[in-house]
Curated annotation (Swiss-Prot):
Protein name: tRNA sulfurtransferase
Gene from which this protein is expressed: thiI
Active site: 457
Source organism of the structure: Sodalis glossinidius (strain morsitans)
Family matches, as SMART domains: THUMP
Family (UniProt): Belongs to the ThiI family.
Entry keyword annotation includes Secreted: no
InterPro entries assigned: Rhodanese-like_dom, Rhodanese-like_dom_sf, Rossmann-like_a/b/a_fold, ThiI_AANH, ThiI_fer, ThiI_N, THII_Thiazole_biosynth_dom, THUMP_dom
Cysteine pairs bridged by disulfides in the record: 344-457
Localization per Swiss-Prot or TrEMBL: Cytoplasm
Residues in THUMP domain copies: 61-165
C-alpha cells in the first residue's frame, strides 16, 4: 500500500529554507497521526511530495481517511507501483487496471514524469489513450470534463498507477505557525473558528468560561476533543476552564443592563489574555462575525479589543450564519452545537450596539477585579489527551424530566428576563416562579426547600444543565419540566 502526498500549493512557493521546514513538519505530523493506524507505516519526504508506505492492506481505509484530515496536504494519490519496460508495457498495465472502469464512458489520460526518458508525457498520453480507445468497448476520448480521468505517473523506472485521488484539507501543517488560544463555547462559531486556525497551521489551545456547571463543561470538552482528535492530533494542546459564574454575578450586581454584554466580553478577553501570557501564546481566537449580535458591531468589537494588548483573531468576521453552520456540519461539530445553550447573549435585556468607551470604563470602575483575578488564578488546565479518559471514568449524571405537575410543585422559569416578559409562562392551578438561570447558583438556596422545583426553558437544554448543576451543589428537589 502506497500513497503519494501532494503539498498545498502555498507551501511550494515558499523560499527553499521555509519550504523545507514546512515539509519536515508535515512529515512529522503524518508520522505522529498514522502511528495510531498502523505502526509499520513509513513516511519519506521528497522535495515536491511525501511518500507513505504501510505493510498491512487492512489498514488502507484508516490511513487514507487520516491523511485527508491533516492540514498541509492538497491531495492524496493511492497508487500501485510497478516496473515498466517500454511505452507499450505501460499501456498494457493501464488497460488491465482500467478496462472495466472505462466501459461506456468518456475518458482522458493524464501523465506526469520524473527522470530522463526518450519520450514526453504527451507521447504517453496519446499512446495509452489511443490504445484504450481502440480496445475498451463503447468508450470515447474527451479531454474536457470526462467521466473518468486515467492518472499515471512515471518516476524514473517505476510506473505509478493511480487507483484513487483523495482531496486533502489544504492549509499549512500544524506547528508551522505560532500557538493560539481559542475562546470556545461549544456553539457553531467557536468550533468553526478553531478549525480554521488549525487548518492555517496553528496549534490551537482552548479556553472555556464556565457559566453552566459541570454538565455544560463536559459538552464543551467533547467539542474541543473532537476538533483536536479529528484535525490536530499530531500535537499536544491544553484545555483551560475558568469558573466565570462569580464574574457574571459581579457584573449583574454592579453594571448597568445595556453595558453588561460588552463588559462580560472584555472580562473574558482580559482573563484569556492572562492565560495566554502564562503559556507564551501569541493570539486569541473568537467566533465573532460582524453584526451577528449586538456585541459584534465595529464599535463594540473595538472596545472589546481595547481590553487587552493581546492580538485577537476573528476568522469568521465576514461569514454569514448559514455558511458557518455548513462548515460546522462538514467538520462534525454541528450536532454538538445544536444542543449547546447560549449563555453570553442573554444576561442583558437591552444591549447597546454602540458602546461608549468612557461609559464602559465608568461601569467597570464599580467592578471588583479581585473576582476576575481569582477566576484566572483558579483556572483548571488539562492536557486535551486526558479528557476522554477523565470523562469516561466520571459517573453519568441524570436528572428526571417530566410533563406531569403535582399540586404542591413549583415550576421555575429560568429563561432570561426578556424571554420571560416576551412570552410569559402561565399554568392553571400550578405556581410559577421566575429566576433567570444566571442567578440560580446564588439564589436557589433562598427558596423554600420543602417544595419540588421543576425547571423550565423553551428547549429543555438549559433547564437540564441547570438541574444537573443544582444536583452537584447538593439540591435534590429539582426536575426538568417539559410540557
Amino acid at each position: 500500500m502506497k500513497f503519494i502526498i501532494k503539498l498545498f500549493p502555498e507551501i511550494t512557493i515558499k523560499s527553499q529554507s521555509v519550504r523545507l521546514r514546512f515539509i519536515k513538519i508535515l512529515t512529522s505530523n503524518i508520522r505522529n497521526i498514522l502511528k495510531h493506524c498502523d505502526e509499520s507505516v513509513a513516511v519519506v519526504r521528497h522535495w515536491d511530495h511525501i511518500e507513505v508506505r504501510a505493510g498491512d492492506e487492512q489498514h488502507r481505509p484508516l490511513v487514507a481517511d487520516a491523511l485527508t484530515l491533516i492540514p498541509g496536504i492538497h491531495h492524496i494519490l493511492a497508487v500501485e507501483e510497478r516496473p515498466w519496460q517500454d511505452m507499450h508495457d505501460i499501456y498494457l498495465q493501464t488497460l488491465v487496471m482500467y478496462r472495466d472502469r472505462l466501459v461506456g464512458k468518456s475518458f482522458c489520460v493524464r501523465v506526469k514524469r520524473r527522470g530522463t526518458h526518450d519520450f514526453t508525457s504527451q507521447d504517453v498520453e496519446r499512446y495509452v489513450g489511443g490504445g484504450l480507445n481502440q480496445n475498451v468497448d463503447n468508450t470515447r476520448v474527451k479531454l474536457t470534463h470526462p467521466d473518468e480521468t486515467v492518472l499515471l505517473e512515471i518516476d524514473n523506472d517505476r510506473l505509478l498507477l493511480i487507483t484513487e485521488r483523495l482531496e486533502g484539507l489544504g492549509g499549512f501543517p500544524i506547528g508551522t505557525q505560532e500557538d493560539v488560544l481559542s475562546l470556545i463555547s461549544g456553539g457553531f462559531d467557536s468550533g468553526v473558528s478553531s478549525y480554521m486556525l488549525m487548518r492555517r497551521g496553528c496549534r490551537v489551545n482552548y479556553c472555556f468560561f464556565n457559566l453552566g456547571g459541570a454538565a455544560h463543561e463536559i459538552g464543551v470538552r467533547q467539542v474541543a476533543h473532537h476538533l483536536w482528535r479529528r484535525f490536530g492530533q499530531s500535537h499536544k494542546v491544553r484545555f483551560v476552564s475558568l469558573d466565570f459564574a462569580p464574574v457574571v454575578n459581579e457584573i449583574l450586581a454592579k453594571v448597568e443592563d445595556g453595558q453588561m454584554g460588552i463588559v462580560l466580553k472584555r472580562m473574558m478577553v482580559r482573563a484569556a489574555s492572562a492565560i495566554a501570557e502564562r503559556y507564551g501564546i501569541q493570539a486569541l481566537v473568537t467566533g465573532e462575525a460582524l453584526g451577528q449580535v449586538s456585541s459584534q458591531t465595529l464599535t463594540n468589537l473595538r472596545l472589546i479589543d481595547n481590553a487587552s494588548d493581546t492580538l485577537i483573531l476573528r476568522p469568521l468576521i465576514s461569514h454569514d450564519k448559514e455558511h458557518i453552520i455548513t462548515l460546522a456540519h462538514q467538520i462534525g461539530t454541528e450536532e454538538y452545537a445544536k444542543t449547546m445553550p447560549e449563555y453570553c447573549g442573554v444576561i442583558s435585556k437591552s444591549p447597546t450596539v454602540r458602546a461608549v468607551k468612557s461609559r464602559i470604563e465608568q461601569e467597570e470602575g464599580q467592578f471588583d477585579f479581585a473576582v476576575l483575578e481569582t477566576a484566572v488564578a483558579q483556572a483548571q488546565v488539562v492536557d486535551i489527551r486526558e479528557l476522554v479518559a477523565e470523562e469516561g471514568n466520571a459517573p453519568v449524571a441524570e436528572v428526571e424530566t417530566t410533563a406531569e405537575l403535582g399540586s404542591g410543585d413549583v415550576v421555575l422559569d429560568i429563561r432570561s428576563q426578556d424571554e420571560q416578559e416576551g412570552c410569559p409562562l402561565t399554568l392553571a392551578n400550578v405556581a410559577v416562579q421566575t429566576l433567570p438561570f444566571y442567578k440560580l447558583g446564588s439564589h436557589f438556596g433562598e427558596l423554600d426547600q420543602s417544595k419540588l422545583y421543576l425547571l423550565y426553558c423553551d428547549r429543555g437544554v438549559m433547564s437540564r444543565l441547570q438541574a444537573l448543576y443544582l444536583r452537584e451543589q447538593g439540591f435534590q428537589n429539582v426536575k426538568v419540566y417539559r410540557p
